[in-house]
Amino acid sequence: MELTLTRISTGFYDFYQTNFHFYWRWKLVWEFSPKQKTFACPSMIRYNKRKKIEGDTMFYTYLRGLVMLILWSINGNAHYHNTDKIPSQDENYILVAPHRTWWDPVYMAFATKPKQFVFMAKKELFSNRIFGWWIRMCGAFPIDRENPSASAIKYPINVLKKSDRSLIMFPSGSRHSNDVKGGVALIAKMAKVRIMPVTYTGPMTLKGLISRERVDMNFGNPIDISDIKKMNDEGIEMVAERIQSEFQRLDEETKQWHNNKKPNPLWWFIRIPALILAVLVAIITIICSFIASFIWNPEKNKIN
């Protein structure tokens, strides 16, 4: 019977997850298990060899909550519509939207909680050590826009099939395009999942966000493409038309709710302390993430 080290603890803070733990407590805790092929080392990381996942679920939940606290503190005027149309937590799907701001993915992820997602990101975003580590930990994978590889399609398909995470995609590919590209159609068809459209209507600039302009997230009808037998040019065009049509319908529907009415300014008495707290937590998170980025590589523990 082989005894393997499964946990090391030191310090004061915990991140719990199925295969990845930071333990910062006041004393060292040693645990041995004859059943699990696990190990730990002085770097304070626990890694379960038996299971590969697409990011750290606990860190994802933590970071999503922290970013939403910051957005709530500086804006606090977000509204979510037709959330009853979102598929159940047991179903994987592709959440698609026209990419309009830097923060619309956060609102998308928050509105669909507790569901977690993986998402594509241009490779340049991974060059920053801390931000790149954050998005990798949350399940992001890099895409080379100039020379896209087969993994850009293969990886999200495997995630949708083998895990309980869904996929966020912006079919236009960037914030400067409205054309729906074919990647989402191929992934949805091969993974046999539905496409869930959502639109963001709200401030396009940081100034507008801080001035508390209204944010509306409107969810559409899930799009089933199982009736399209072949994903040739014609099939991809049919999917693109369905997605674009739903985007246009959602934008038109949102007009009835969207206005420039701002919340009571007295709310700032609550939001300012919340923002200060969020910033302090963010600073601690940045410091800890910088240290952790030298220790833990999320790429070694993802679905292939």
Protein language model features and the residues they cover:
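Non-catalytic C-terminal accessory region of glycerolipid acyltransferases
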Residues: 15, 49-58, 151-304
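Ser/Thr/Pro/Gly-rich low-complexity, intrinsically disordered segments
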Residues: 5, 18-20, 35
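Acidic, Ala/Val/Gly-enriched low-complexity intrinsically disordered segments
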Residues: 2, 14, 29-31, 40
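A generic structural signal for well-ordered alpha-helical segments
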Residues: 71, 112, 134-135, 160, ...
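Membrane-anchoring hydrophobic helices of lipid-metabolizing enzymes
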Residues: 16-19, 24-26, 39-94, 104-106, ...
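A conditional alpha-helix N-cap/helix-loop micro-motif detector
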Residues: 76, 146-150, 177
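Catalytic core of membrane glycerolipid acyltransferases/transacylases, capturing the structured
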Residues: 59-60, 87-147, 155
